[in-house]
Amino acid sequence: MGPPPAAPAAAAELFGPRLAAAERFTELLATAGVERGLIGPRETDRLWERHVINCGVLAEVVPEGADAVDVGSGAGLPGIPLALARPDVRVVLLEPMERRCRFLQEVVAAVGLEEQVSVLRGRAPDAGIGPEGRRFGVAVARAVAPLERLGAILLPMLQPGGVMLAMRGSRILEELQDARGSLGTQGWHPVDVVVCGEGRVDEPTRVLRAVRSSQLSRAEGRKGRGDGERHDGRQVRRTARDSRRSREVDRDQPTRGQSRST
């Protein structure tokens, strides 16, 4: 386990005056992150491009002044790079595992983000987030769940008109083709794929962008609460059950700036 490589020019362009904080974050990923099992030891040499910059370029598609939640934040990816790249965006790092939350709290303090970023332990239903609690303008997620399930998890966490930004791999268009019908039924419209970071990184970041409909019908709303296909209701019950288990255990490619609607 060694230190990460020096920050590339793309990092200076992306993080600007916060480059030193991004360097500190990357160093923590390479040391404490590896020691605590949040980052694989083989990832150290590619932390900048594969993780930090890869996540930070989400800044290109986050609305100005957004109130965002990073769902299943893990090592702080993508939430912390997003916050570093966008000082105007407030970020909540939502993470169910206590040991990961401790790491995130240490990182937030070490990089000086206490006024912009907060750490919340739990899952959406039992963390005061959702239909009966706080809702966000943006929800970001990286490698959390298949798209159909992810859509069901994130929909009740967002305000009407809120945006889901799901980082996916090279098969994003195939995934979307399979999940398109379910996402529409859940209440996501429009849905498209955007590419972030072109010209900054060798492999740009592919993001599924979906907007929560602001004009759901009553019938659609009931589906979200458990009628019909019951995507939302079923997921809320599942995540609540998973949360209890968690506490017991541990405690295709458009050009830059363009999108492909589906």
Swiss-Prot record:
Q: Where is the composition biased (Basic and acidic residues)?
A: 219-254
The entry's keywords:
Cytoplasm, Methyltransferase, rRNA processing, S-adenosyl-L-methionine, Transferase
Protein family (similarity comment): Belongs to the methyltransferase superfamily. RNA methyltransferase RsmG family.
Protein name in the entry: Ribosomal RNA small subunit methyltransferase G
Q: Which InterPro entries match?
A: rRNA_ssu_MeTfrase_G, SAM-dependent_MTases_sf
Where does this protein hold S-adenosyl-L-methionine? G72, L77, R142
EC id: 2.1.1.-
Q: Which residue intervals make up region (Disordered)?
A: 212-262
Q: What does this protein do?
A: Specifically methylates the N7 position of guanine in position 518 of 16S rRNA.
Matching entries from NCBIfam families are given as: rsmG_gidB
Task: Give GO MF terms, alphabetically.
Answer: rRNA (guanine-N7-)-methyltransferase activity
Please tell me which top-level EC class this enzyme sits in: transferase
| HAMAP family linked | 16SrRNA_methyltr_G (MF_00074)
Q: Where in the cell is it found?
A: Cytoplasm
GO cellular component entries: cytosol
Q: Which organism is it from?
A: Frankia alni (strain DSM 45986 / CECT 9034 / ACN14a)
* Pfam families (UniProt xref): GidB
- Has UniProt tagged this entry with the keyword Secreted? no
